UniProtKB/Swiss-Prot annotation:
The keyword Iron applies. This is 2,3-dihydroxyphenylpropionate/2,3-dihydroxicinnamic acid 1,2-dioxygenase. Keywords: Aromatic hydrocarbons catabolism, Dioxygenase, Iron, Oxidoreductase. It comes from Mycolicibacterium paratuberculosis (strain ATCC BAA-968 / K-10). Belongs to the LigB/MhpB extradiol dioxygenase family.
Length: 312
């Protein structure tokens, strides 16, 4: 058994017009460093904790956590469309181990995943299907949300199971850090949008194009300082990164959902995927972060971070 970790932010704007060449070059250079770490490790299995943006999970049934025993990319924002290489038996065994550890988790035999899962895989491996992958959905936008300590418990249970495998496993977390992009909510969404976020009504090509244009416009306004969206919070981002860098994950148990929203924004709850991933790594013992990157990126409407880590 061996474990290693790579966590990174994601953004649809990495695949869209708008961000400056300097910013993209800086992020690409950081991703290349992370890619080198992963290539040297050469994982035989990837387990990725990731959120969803109303592409695979909807309010009709919104589990806090779900493991996919089969999964397909929906192809949003130019990412991979089609099946992922999910080892079904390992995924089901992992789900059983998590349940046995006292963490209630759903299982999907047909999980749809979006750019939150696929983009980091493509950035690290070139394609989303180059390695066997077990996707673990972590709800980060569909309120009510559970407490942070349950995300840590989820990760610890997954990591304990992975420690029983005779494989090199890369654990990933996708999302964050501080950001509050325009995301529909039950309280504010108009009826057509409610049909989508509650019942999963499919989007037409025209609707997807309109959403993409809206994201580009929102980022342009945000970067220009002409936006009502909640500002990024680099101070809070660095506080979070410092906690995970020193392995003090239990400190995050005290971070209430209202605190995360107030400090980091409505979508900052994606840090839950990082908490789960680092808890999975920590289940194998103390760890050290080996590559650290952070930049506040208004052009992406996100505090963009990358970490790699391995056991000490």
């Amino acid at each position: 058994m061996a474990l290693a970790l790579c966590c990174m932010s994601h953004s649809p704007l990495l695949n869209l017009p708008g961000p400056s060449r300097d910013l993209l070059d800086d992020i690409d250079a950081a991703i290349a460093r992370a890619r080198g770490f992963v290539e040297d490790y050469d994982p035989q299995l990837v387990v990725i904790f990731s959120p969803d943006h109303y592409n695979g999970f909807f309010y009709k049934v919104m589990p806090p956590f779900c493991i996919g025993s089969s999964a397909s990319g929906v192809g949003d924002y130019g990412t991979h469309a089609g099946p992922l290489d999910v080892p079904e038996k390992l995924a089901v065994d992992c789900a059983q181990a998590v349940l046995d550890a006292g963490v209630d988790i759903a299982v999907s035999a047909s999980m749809d995943v979006d750019h939150g899962t696929v983009q980091p895989l493509e950035k690290l491996f070139g394609t989303a299907i180059s390695r066997p992958v077990i996707p673990v959905f972590v709800n980060a936008i569909g309120v009510p949300l559970g407490p942070m300590h349950r995300c840590r418990a989820l990760g610890a249970a997954v990591g304990t199971y992975l420690a029983t495998l005779d494989k090199r496993v890369l654990v990933m977390g996708s999302g964050g850090l501080s950001h509050s992009p325009p995301v529909p909510t039950l309280a504010t969404a108009p009826e057509p949008v409610l049909q989508r976020i509650v019942h999963g009504a499919p989007m037409t090509a025209e609707q997807r194009q309109a959403r993409q244009a809206a994201v580009i416009d929102a980022a342009r306004s945000f970067a220009a300082g002409d936006s009502a969206l909640q500002p990024l919070n680099p101070t809070w981002d660095h506080r979070f990164l410092e906690i995970i860098d020193r392995g003090s994950l239990s400190e995050l148990d005290r971070w209430s959902n209202s605190f995360v929203t107030h400090e980091g924004g409505g979508s900052a709850h994606e840090i839950r995927t990082w908490v789960a991933a680092f808890a999975a790594l920590q289940a194998a013992g103390p760890y050290e972060t080996t590559m650290r990157y952070y930049t506040p990126a208004p052009e992406l409407i996100a505090g963009f971070a990358i970490r790699t880590a391995r056991p000490k």
